[in-house]
Amino acid sequence: MKQTDNIEKNKHKYTGNRLKHIISSLPYAFLSLFSKRDKKIIVFSAMHCETFDSNSKFLFLHFLNNEKEFSPYFVINNDDLRQKLIQEYGEHFIDTRTKEGKKLAIKARTWIISWLDTPLEGMFLKFRRLVIHLGHGTPLKGLGMTEKDGKLIKKIYYLLGQTNISYSLASTEFTGDIVRRCIGFSKKHILVNGQPRTEVVFKEKKQIEGIQDDYTHVLYAPTWRQYAKIKLFPFQDFSLQKLQEILEQEKIKIHIRFHPAYEEDIPQDLLRLENISLFSAKKYTEIMDYLNIFDVLITDYSSIYFDYMLLERPMIFLPYDLAEYEGTVGFTIDYNKYTPGDKPNTFEEFIKCLLNAKNNPETYTDSIKKLNLFLNSLDKEPCKSLTTFIKGKI
């Protein structure tokens, strides 16, 4: 199946699921306007109310472990995942496809979301309720109201979403303007605070199989394109044999991470190399939990590099189709100005950049530090400051 076919299939799937959720939620959303709120109940949700990840996950865990006066719940409308999470964390996961789940969501004084998907669908759901949209990272590519290929129906969806959200999170004043333009908000609805997901970057590294301390570990995380398959090592002079020789000689391992739906698109001849492996999004679902184990990041347009900048480690950018991507998707900022790292055009240049990243990791440190002031909050405990804000609003 072609990548574009996969994308369309997923779009229809999520559109259908969202439509069902909206229809089944409407009576409860209306009832919600008049129901009594419980200040101690906080309901969290992530993508399509089906995943346990991103900013919502990390703030939820903070409340669960540290704020004992609150009753946090996470919406997981996926039976298998919900049961797995209940076994791990306890009875803190609800299904808003059920009457019981809907009723609990209605009672909550506070909703925390990472996408625009709310625990219940509807309009004006922020009425007598605090609804904070945390997002799932600082947007680099055109998103929402700034998408170059955005359809009218999607823009309408974002306009409707505005009626449900009290505040949308941004790491800095600078990125606040980006978020404001993407969602179509006014400045007064932007909450400047560090992102909960970045807190884990400063914690102790996880010990996982295949990550040895005597190697330089590189995360290669390109972003998917709607218009074409991803080209790995996109150089005309690329040599598979030479790549393996260099990696083996220099004790470098490259870990490739794709969107989970397209991992099968990774060329098998690459994965057969001893020093290249798949860092599967299916196995390692939350990349933030593992970001600090990597010494170098290779990407193109993935906003993961904003988070990686907090580590002040070297990055290599491979924007091989920059003009096409900018024309089709667009960017929220000047790409070349705000990407502090080498951008090789040939395989020979790439090898030089890779070795420089290994042997001279401080090359771009000053540039990264300066850009961090614009792109990232340097708060190492953003969950605490966000919790203080929430308590002050309810």
Q: Regions from the language model: what does each represent?
A:
Residues 39-40, 129, 215-218:
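Nucleotide donor/acceptor-binding cores
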Residues 273, 303-374:
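Catalytic binding pocket for nucleotide-activated donors in carbohydrate/polymer assembly enzymes
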Residues 1-49, 54:
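Membrane-proximal basic amphipathic "stem/tether" segments
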Residues 94-110, 260-306:
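Donor nucleotide-activated moiety binding/catalytic core segment of transferases
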Residues 53-64, 190-192, 196-269, 344, ...:
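Conserved catalytic-core segment of nucleotide-activated headgroup transferases in glycan assembly
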Residues 41-202:
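Active-site and donor-binding regions of nucleotide-sugar-utilizing enzymes
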Residues 111-118, 122-135, 139-142, 285-328:
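A donor-sugar binding/catalytic signature common to diverse glycosyltransferases
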Residues 2-15, 347-394:
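C-terminal amphipathic helix plus adjacent low-complexity
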